[in-house]
From Swiss-Prot:
Keywords carried by this UniProt record: Acetylation, DNA-binding, Metal-binding, Nucleus, Repeat, Transcription, Transcription regulation, Zinc, Zinc-finger
Designated gene of the protein: ZNF22
Pfam families: zf-C2H2
InterPro entries: C2H2-ZF_Transcription_Reg (IPR050717), Znf_C2H2_sf (IPR036236), Znf_C2H2_type (IPR013087)
Protein family: Belongs to the krueppel C2H2-type zinc-finger protein family.
Keyword Acetylation set for record: yes
UniProt function note: Binds DNA through the consensus sequence 5'-CAATG-3'. May be involved in transcriptional regulation and may play a role in tooth formation.
Protein name as it appears in the record: Zinc finger protein 22
GO-annotated molecular function: DNA binding; zinc ion binding
Biological source species: Bos taurus (Bovine)
Keyword Nucleus: yes
SUPFAM superfamilies (alphabetical): beta-beta-alpha zinc fingers (SSF57667)
Length: 225
């Protein structure tokens, strides 16, 4: 008895057993690297796992695993920011960046911590916050082994080993390893400016008074003659 063609447009080759295809939207499958994987999202994940990046940028030769990622990257070279905020007019390369920016205007905080209920505008901020509860410190210093919950804290710490001081005071040229230390330092200059201004004003007033007295004395002497 001859069997009819299976539903869903599936074609099989029992002799080879290599290719399995399902033309329905949810089901295209192929056998690769000794395993059967979903052709859409699973294959893209497998490509990333194997570091396969077939899509290359002609401008900088940077490679990507997905064509959509390459398309977004190319906007950096063209300078085209096609996603514009209707509230302030600021433009962005990617729609996801515009969505994040819009939360500045709306105040929306869609990411909620299950432990304490605090909300955040970005998922990355929530992930960093959750490490307060879990105690996770995934960033380790290669020099001393000290661990940190945020990569920015590790970068700041590493400057204690390298001696790097990238933040320079525009007033006196003094350098600092952290931006917070520079901000504290600039307050010293801000406090000095009013004192200098008051000092200059006092000297100017004293000089004017002395000049006035001297002039008055000369006029009096001339009158006596």
């Amino acid at each position: 008895m001859r069997l009819g063609k299976p539903k869903g447009g599936i074609s099989r080759s029992s002799s080879q057993g290599k290719v399995y295809e399902n033309q329905r939207k949810t089901g295209r499958q192929r056998q690769r690297w000794g395993m059967t994987v979903r052709f859409d999202s699973s294959l893209r994940r497998l490509r990333r796992g194997l570091d396969e990046k077939p899509y290359k940028c002609v401008e900088c030769e940077k490679s990507f695993s997905q064509s959509s990622t390459l398309f977004q990257h190319q906007k950096i070279h063209t300078g085209k920011k096609s996603h514009k905020c209707a509230d302030c007019g600021k433009s962005f390369f990617q729609s996801s960046n515009l969505i994040q920016h819009r939360r500045v205007h709306t105040g929306e905080k869609p990411y909620r911590c299950d432990e304490c209920g605090e909300r955040f505008k970005q998922s990355s901020n929530l992930i960093q916050h959750q490490r307060i509860h879990t105690g996770e410190k995934p960033y380790q210093c290669d020099e001393c082994g000290r661990c940190f919950s945020q990569s920015s804290h590790l970068i700041q710490h590493q400057r204690t080993h390298t001696g790097e001081k990238p933040y320079q005071c525009s007033e006196c040229g003094k350098c600092f390893s952290q931006s917070s230390h520079l901000r504290q330092h600039t307050k010293v200059h801000e406090e000095e400016k009013p004192r200098k201004t008051r000092g200059r004003s006092l000297r100017a007033k004293t000089h004017s008074l002395s000049s006035w007295k001297a002039g008055k004395g000369r006029r009096s002497a001339a009158g006596l003659r």
